[in-house]
């Protein structure tokens, strides 16, 4: 009550923020008349003027009013679009490094031109991040016209570009691209062998479109660059064949003489927990699997991998559904994004799950992959000096944005009042009743000509509904992951009179639904069908389409605008709001309603008990619908439960990934330092000194006479690392202590290294140090990532031993990292001290071979091995081409 009173007096935080920005809007508006009198050249020259003023010490904040006024004028001249006052506020919020929540149709794409123009003045680059290649290309061409007019260069990063094209795009003033491409480019850069091969610049300022989709929905999926392992794929087929023979059971609670008075009994061969997305073998199931696979003990350490594959095969059959979680296209299993309904080619589930699903569907099984480089979107975007974002729905996740990204959300008012009533949910007992009601409403609205957008949560449901409409003879379009090529075309026409469109999740579709249809899209489509027509004919047809759409627009408005019909609530309220948000844009009329049933996943898994009780209490019969505030509240509570659960998963992921992130930063910084080559000799000498100190410490025991030290062990270790034996006269030996032993060894090691430098020359020795360091770091880092994966898998079990798994993970991951750094040091020192003079072509061949051993993602899509150059393959027992004098298998072929 007190907080409500305070809010009434001083306004909410959002209201105070908007109040602070309105005077700056006034400043920009006051500049408009003067700016509009400038010629095109004078307007363009303003960019150079701003750069000079910034160079002389003026801040971007002081340049903002004039820069925004210039950008607004360019928009009017080039695109015929003038930024509204609320769009200026949106631009200021983005410039401040915050999230601007702007409703659908409020022109987020145009808003981004303001802060991107202002921040491009620094010359440090601006990244505008979108969810797919289509939007990246469209926005760079469309909005890029404003920036090009003002003398700035615009680049675009999309799938299929080579490194030269990528570098050129990143060097532009403003770069449009997808989150995946930006992330993969970062990982690929940190696998390269020369700084000049890097494509990205420093991380200055990013504007993330559909920020909730990228930073929240996709945050659970890390970006991974991987190479295939050599494991056999037969095991997946063998295990897949036994899963249909297992019987699904359930968990039964029985009364028992226990503390709680109850105990759980498991029936069948396995049980499924849909909330936790897990499937577990019962005791009976374990015995049955052992019998079917002819193994004695499934939990024997030798068969632990088989147990893992059985569990993954169970999940594949019990939890992952065709046309819901994935599709099979051209003999390949492709993941469907659960939030946007888009296909995600190139993405694979890890840990053998993807292979289990491939076996289930009877398609070719690809080998499991080993991680070579990985990063989460959370940690990638936190590298930017300044980060901001736009979306139609961020306020529900404001707490998460603040906690994880330190980003505040500002809700921007709409330019025109929202006229869309959102009707209460209608709930039925069964899905069949619900779908019958949906069909009846669609039939009724279609008959009077009102356009309808029907939202479903999976491909399977969209096709089921489409079949029901087909039987009723109602013409309709279907938009799901299978028809994504026609996406923009279908969405653009969804507002036409009498149009019925069925769509899976509408998140991030990026195309406005215009009432009466989109004349521009219709013209483009007509031109594609009639490529031979003259420009004159095309202009004439375009004018006809325009006239037709204006007429239809008025008719559709009089019918009530676009009606949104949701057929199921999503786990996230945000996705529901995004579906609703497709209607009522820019003051247009519209309406929305959700039809639900107790058999829907959300209600069945998270809220059915409470809702069922309410329906029983209200004595709802089959076939009868209910609209009640209590039900709506129960559904929203179920959604909040799921959202909180998903937030915990993401927070858990980032807590674990933060450990890896610090290690990744150390390794990548070390690689960059080596590639820069300025301190490479000093780094190597430091490694040598550390190795000597470790040897002295390991063999020279403080309180034991020097004559009793393990001299043979020391001599062998020194020989292994540095290539010489320790030969100390007995009289000298007696006077030694750990400190002067270290000095003695250091002196001898420096002498041997100086001889190497004299023999090879400074240039060649530095080159060899660089090549060998990179080779060791990359090989050891790859193995370290595998060790970390294994550590993650088993760390949860520490909880049973009364230990905090997170703390144990941090401790052990740190120890693994330190062990890896020790191995890198030993490997580098040993190889340099053992290296022999080799011909220049041998060194080049070694470098080439080292590059070929790596696997890189081709444009962020699928892993492909680089084509090997034509050269003789080195046998494992042949001398190593690096010139170390060792066999290849004991040197670079390890």
UniProtKB/Swiss-Prot annotation:
SMART domains: SecA_DEAD (SM00957), SecA_PP_bind (SM00958). ATP binds at residues 87, 105-109, 512. Its EC number is 7.4.2.8. GO terms for molecular function: ATP binding; metal ion binding; protein-exporting ATPase activity. It is found in: Cell inner membrane; Cytoplasm. It is an enzyme of class 7 (translocase). Zn(2+) binds at residues 880, 882, 891-892. GO terms for cellular component: cell envelope Sec protein transport complex; cytosol; plasma membrane. Residues 854-894 are annotated as: Disordered. It comes from the Bacteria. Its main location: membrane. Its cofactor is Zn(2+). One of its GO terms (biological process) is intracellular protein transmembrane transport. InterPro entries: Helicase_ATP-bd, Helicase_C-like, P-loop_NTPase, SEC_C_motif, SecA, SecA_CS, SecA_DEAD, SecA_motor_DEAD. Keywords: ATP-binding, Cell inner membrane, Cell membrane, Cytoplasm, Membrane, Metal-binding, Nucleotide-binding, Protein transport, Translocase, Translocation, Transport, Zinc. It is a peripheral membrane protein. May bind 1 zinc ion per subunit. Gene3D superfamilies: Helical scaffold and wing domains of SecA (1.10.3060.10), P-loop containing nucleotide triphosphate hydrolases (3.40.50.300), SecA, preprotein cross-linking domain (3.90.1440.10). It catalyses: ATP + H2O + cellular proteinSide 1 = ADP + phosphate + cellular proteinSide 2. The keyword Flavoprotein does not apply. Belongs to the SecA family. Part of the Sec protein translocase complex. Interacts with the SecYEG preprotein conducting channel. Has a central role in coupling the hydrolysis of ATP to the transfer of proteins into and across the cell membrane, serving as an ATP-driven molecular motor driving the stepwise translocation of polypeptide chains across the membrane. HAMAP family: SecA. PANTHER family: CHLOROPLAST PROTEIN-TRANSPORTING ATPASE, SECA INNER MEMBRANE COMPONENT OF SEC PROTEIN SECRETION SYSTEM. Monomer and homodimer. Part of the essential Sec protein translocation apparatus which comprises SecA, SecYEG and auxiliary proteins SecDF-YajC and YidC. This is Protein translocase subunit SecA. It comes from Geotalea daltonii (strain DSM 22248 / JCM 15807 / FRC-32).
């Amino acid at each position: 009550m007190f907080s409500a009173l305070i809010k009434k007096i001083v306004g909410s935080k959002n209201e105070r923020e908007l109040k602070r920005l309105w005077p700056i809007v006034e400043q920009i508006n006051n500049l408009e008349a003067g700016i509009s009198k400038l010629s095109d050249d004078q307007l363009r020259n303003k960019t150079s003027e701003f750069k000079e003023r910034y160079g002389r010490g003026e801040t971007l904040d002081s340049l903002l009013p004039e820069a925004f006024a210039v950008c607004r004028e360019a928009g009017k001249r080039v695109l015929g679009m003038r930024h509204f006052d609320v769009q200026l506020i949106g631009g200021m919020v983005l410039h401040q490094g915050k999230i601007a929540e702007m409703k659908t149709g409020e022109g987020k794409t145009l808003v981004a031109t303001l802060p991107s123009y202002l921040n491009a003045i620094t010359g440090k680059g601006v990244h505008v991040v979108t969810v797919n290649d289509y939007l990246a290309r469209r926005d760079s061409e469309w909005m890029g016209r404003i920036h090009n007019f003002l003398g700035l260069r615009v680049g675009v990063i999309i799938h299929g570009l080579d490194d030269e094209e990528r570098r050129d795009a990143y060097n532009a003033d403003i770069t449009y691209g997808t989150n995946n491409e930006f992330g993969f480019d970062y990982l690929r850069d940190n696998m390269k062998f020369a700084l000049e091969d890097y494509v990205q610049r420093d991380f200055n300022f990013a504007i993330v479109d559909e920020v909730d989709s990228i930073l929240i929905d996709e945050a659970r999926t890390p970006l991974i660059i991987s190479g295939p392992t050599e494991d056999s794929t037969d095991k997946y087929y063998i295990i897949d064949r036994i899963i249909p023979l297992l019987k699904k059971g359930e968990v039964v609670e029985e009364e028992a003489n226990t503390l709680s008075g109850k105990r759980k009994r498991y029936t069948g061969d396995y049980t499924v927990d849909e909330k936790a997305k897990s499937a577990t073998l019962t005791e009976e199931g374990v015995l049955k699997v052992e019998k079917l696979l002819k193994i004695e003990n499934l939990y024997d350490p030798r068969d632990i991998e088989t147990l893992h594959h059985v569990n993954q095969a169970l999940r594949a059959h019990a939890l992952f559904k065709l046309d819901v979680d994935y599709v099979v296209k051209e003999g390949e299993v492709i993941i469907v994004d659960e939030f946007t309904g888009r296909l995600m080619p190139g993405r694979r589930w890890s840990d053998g799950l993807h292979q289990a699903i491939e076996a289930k569907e009877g398609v070719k099984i690809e080998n499991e992959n080993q991680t070579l480089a990985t990063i989460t979107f959370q940690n990638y975007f936190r590298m930017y000096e300044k980060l901001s974002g736009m979306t139609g729905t961020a306020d529900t996740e404001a707490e998460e944005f603040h906690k994880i990204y330190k980003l505040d959300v500002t809700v921007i008012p709409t330019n025109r009042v929202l006229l869309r009533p959102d009707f209460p949910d209608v709930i039925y007992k069964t899905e069949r009743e619900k779908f019958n009601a949906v069909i009846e409403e669609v039939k009724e609205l279609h008959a009077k000509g009102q356009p309808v957008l029907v939202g479903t949560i999976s491909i399977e449901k969209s096709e089921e509904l489409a079949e029901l409409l087909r039987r009723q003879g109602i013409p309709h379009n279907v938009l799901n992951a299978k028809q994504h090529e026609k996406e923009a075309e279908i969405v653009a026409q969804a507002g036409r009179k009498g149009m019925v469109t069925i769509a899976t999740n509408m998140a991030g579709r990026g195309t406005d639904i215009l009432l009466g249809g989109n004349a521009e899209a219709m013209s483009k489509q007509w031109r594609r069908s009639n490529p031979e027509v003259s420009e004159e004919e095309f202009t004439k047809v375009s004018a006809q389409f325009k006239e037709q759409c204006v007429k239809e627009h008025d008719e559709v408005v009089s019918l009530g605008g676009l009606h949104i019909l949701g057929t199921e609530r999503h786990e996230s309220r945000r996705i529901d709001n995004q579906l609703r948000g497709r209607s009522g844009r820019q003051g247009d009329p519209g309406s929305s309603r959700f039809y639900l049933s107790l058999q829907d996943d959300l209600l069945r898994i998270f809220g059915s008990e409470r809702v069922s009780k309410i329906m029983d209490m209200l004595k709802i019969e089959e076939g009868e619908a209910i609209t009640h505030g209590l039900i709506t509240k129960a559904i929203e509570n179920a959604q909040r439960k799921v959202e909180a659960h998903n937030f915990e998963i993401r927070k858990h992921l980032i807590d674990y990934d933060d450990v890896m992130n610090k290690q990744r930063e150390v390794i990548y910084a070390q690689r960059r330092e080596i590639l820069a080559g300025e301190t490479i000799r000093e780094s190597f000498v430091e490694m040598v000194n550390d190795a000597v100190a470790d040897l002295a410490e390991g063999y020279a025991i403080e309180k034991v006479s020097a004559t009793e030290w393990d001299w043979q062990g020391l001599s062998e270790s020194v020989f292994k690392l540095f290539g010489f034996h320790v030969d100390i006269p007995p009289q000298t030996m007696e006077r030694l202590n750990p400190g002067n032993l270290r000095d003695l060894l250091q002196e001898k090691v420096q002498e041997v290294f100086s001889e190497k430098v004299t023999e090879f020359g400074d240039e060649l020795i530095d080159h060899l140090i660089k090549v060998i360091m990179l080779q060791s770091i990359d090989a050891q880092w790859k193995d370290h990532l595998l060790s970390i994966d294994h550590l993650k898998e088993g760390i949860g079990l520490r909880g049973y031993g009364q230990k905090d798994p997170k703390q144990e993970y941090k401790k052990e991951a740190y120890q693994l990292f330190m062990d890896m750094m020790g191995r890198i040091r030993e490997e580098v020192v040993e190889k340099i001290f053992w290296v022999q003079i080799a011909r220049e072509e041998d060194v080049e061949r070694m470098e080439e071979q080292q590059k070929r051993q790596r696997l890189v993602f081709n444009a962020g899509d699928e892993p492909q091995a680089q084509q090997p150059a034509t050269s003789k393959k080195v046998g494992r027992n042949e001398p190593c081409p690096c010139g170390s004098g060792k066999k290849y298998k004991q040197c670079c072929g390890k």
